Amino acid sequence: YPNEYKMYFIEKTNEFDKWFRKLKDIRAKAKVLFRIQKLQNEEHFGDCKPVGNGISELRINFAKGYRIYFKETDGKIIILLIGGDKSSQQKDIEKAKEIWDKIKE
């Protein structure tokens, strides 16, 4: 079947959970949750680009320009490493790489 339905298993790091809990904007939280749900259910990730070390940045074009940094493993598991927004982008990318290095050890 060329259009085989693929579902991803989503894992979140403590760092991601902490970031998400601190998000004050309820609508931004809803957009982030919706985007994660879409990630889980389809192969097309939308507005997304690689940032190095096999880590990708998922862009949510809302308010501050939210970002979710994730790593796809085994073709079926997505690990949400950390979140942030446009203003902390470079710092978040470095942090995501650090978190991934710790996980894979």
Stretches found by the model and what they are:
Residues L23-K24, S88:
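Alpha-helical hairpin
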Residues K22, K38, K71-E72:
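Conserved catalytic core of Hanks-type protein kinase domains
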Residues Y1-I10, K18, K29, H44, ...:
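Enriched for short, Lys/Arg-rich terminal
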Residues E15-K18, K24, I36:
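N-terminal interaction/assembly modules
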Residues F34-F62:
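A short, surface-exposed loop/turn module that caps and links secondary-structure elements
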